[in-house]
C-alpha cells in the first residue's frame, strides 16, 4: 500500500492528478521569509526569524508521516498539529497553515485521515484504518525522522552558543580563504582535507 501513497505525489500537500502532480507550488517556507514550501525548512532558529543557513527538517513524504504519527496518539485540529510539530522540533520549525492544510487535504484524499467539521467551525482530524496501516508500514522511517530531528535540534542549540558560533565562523572563513586561492595546489587541497578529517575524528572521540 505504501507505494501507492508515497509515489503519487512529488510534493507535500499537493493533490494527486491522474497519478502525478501536475503543478508545483511556487512558494517556499524559509526562516525569515514569508514564503512556503511543503518540505519545511528552518534556520536553526524559530520559524519567522532571520539569520543562519537554511536547514530542511522534512524531506519528501516525511511531513505526512509525522502528522499521521501525531494523529495515532489522539485526534487533533489543524492548529494543534502545528503546535505539536513546533514542539517536536523544539521550536526550531513551525509549519505555516499554508503547509499544513494542503497536506491534510492530500492525506484525506488518500483516505489516510478523516476531517469532520464540529460546532463552531472547528475541524476534527482523525487517523483512519488505512492511515494507521500505512504508518505502521513506515514505522522505521518515522523513528529515523525523529532521531534526525533530535540531532538537528541539538546542533541548533550549539550554534546559539557565542563561542561555538565564533569558532565555526572562523573555520568557514579560513577554509573559504584558502580553498579559493587561485594558486592552491592539489597537494595543499589534500592537506586541508586531511586536517578536516582528523578534526572530525578527534571530535567523535571526545567523552
UniProtKB/Swiss-Prot annotation:
Record-linked InterPro entries: Tscrpt_reg_PadR_N, WH-like_DNA-bd_sf, WH_DNA-bd_sf
Regulation: Divalent metals such as nickel and iron have a similar negative effect on YqjI DNA-binding activity.
GO MF entry, a single one: DNA binding
Gene3D superfamilies from the UniProt entry: Winged helix-like DNA-binding domain superfamily/Winged helix DNA-binding domain
Pfam families: PadR
Gene Ontology terms: cellular component: cytosol
Segments of skewed composition (Basic and acidic residues): 1-40
Name by which UniProt lists this protein: Transcriptional regulator YqjI
Organism: Escherichia coli (strain K12)
UniProt lineage: Bacteria, Pseudomonadati, Pseudomonadota, Gammaproteobacteria, Enterobacterales
Amino acid at each position: 500500500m505504501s507505494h501507492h501513497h508515497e509515489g503519487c505525489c512529488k510534493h507535500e500537500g499537493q493533490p494527486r492528478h491522474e497519478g502525478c502532480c501536475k503543478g508545483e507550488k511556487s512558494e517556499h517556507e524559509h526562516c525569515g521569509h514569508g514564503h512556503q514550501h511543503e518540505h519545511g525548512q528552518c534556520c536553526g532558529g524559530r520559524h519567522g526569524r532571520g539569520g543562519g543557513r537554511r536547514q530542511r527538517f522534512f524531506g519528501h513524504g516525511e511531513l505526512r508521516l509525522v502528522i499521521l504519527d501525531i494523529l495515532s496518539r489522539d485526534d487533533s485540529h489543524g492548529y494543534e498539529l502545528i503546535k505539536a510539530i513546533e514542539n517536536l522540533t523544539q521550536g526550531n520549525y513551525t509549519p505555516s497553515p499554508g503547509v499544513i492544510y494542503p497536506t491534510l487535504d492530500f492525506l484525506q484524499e488518500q483516505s489516510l485521515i478523516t476531517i469532520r467539521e464540529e460546532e463552531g467551525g472547528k475541524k476534527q482530524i482523525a487517523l483512519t484504518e488505512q492511515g494507521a496501516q500505512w504508518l505502521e508500514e513506515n514505522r522505521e522511517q518515522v523513528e529515523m525522522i525523529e532521531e534526525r530531528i533530535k540531532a538537528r535540534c541539538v546542533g541548533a542549540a550549539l550554534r546559539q552558543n557565542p563561542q561555538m558560533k565564533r569558532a565555526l565562523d572562523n573555520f568557514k572563513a579560513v577554509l573559504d580563504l584558502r580553498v579559493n586561492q587561485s594558486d592552491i595546489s592539489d597537494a595543499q587541497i589534500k592537506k586541508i582535507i586531511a586536517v578536516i578529517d582528523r578534526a572530525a575524528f578527534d571530535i567523535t572521540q571526545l567523552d
